Amino acid sequence: GNNACVNIEALTKRLNISFSQSDDFKCRPLRVGDKNCLFAYLDGNIDKVLFEQDVVRPLKNAERLSSPYLENLQNTVAYSDEIKVVPIENAPGEIALCDIAFFIEDDDNAYIFSLRKPSTRAIGEPPTSSVMKGPREGFVEEIKTNTSMIRRRIKSPDLVMKSFQVGRYSATTVAVMYVRGIADENVVKTICEKIRKIDVDGVVDSA
């Protein structure tokens, strides 16, 4: 395309706007050789271990990334599936499908890696005892499991996730999810304000 001058910083801003600054949307810059690159994905929906070892690490260790990019990417990463190539403007739709988009400065394509996390549990078996007695991370992971299950059902960049820490002592993580353009913005604002004001530690016991 003609707008081949892709600036990673400007692209990061554009992507964050596409995802309404959703708290589970992550942009991760990476320098490969002399190129500024960027990964964008939804946290909680990708297999982080495979992502790190098969994609990020080989790229970090690569001396350079040159055109033809698709061919060079396929030769560099340890990812065996086909890397899908889409125009940059289609990237948010691919990210909303829980895939990872990779961008290279001065290239107007997005390279899509599918490293989706397998669903960890069915809805309806909340592991209450481990949440209450176990480590805090378990609880944060649980939130990610729940939000990722919703992401799998509503595959849209307009699905926004905002997370909060509530309770002065328990610092419980709470997530609000809504669809931009469908949910009433004022209602969302009111709900978020009410959650921010929660100061009582009433979430400690769920028995």
State what each model feature region is.
Residues 1-207:
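Membrane-embedded alpha-helical signal segments
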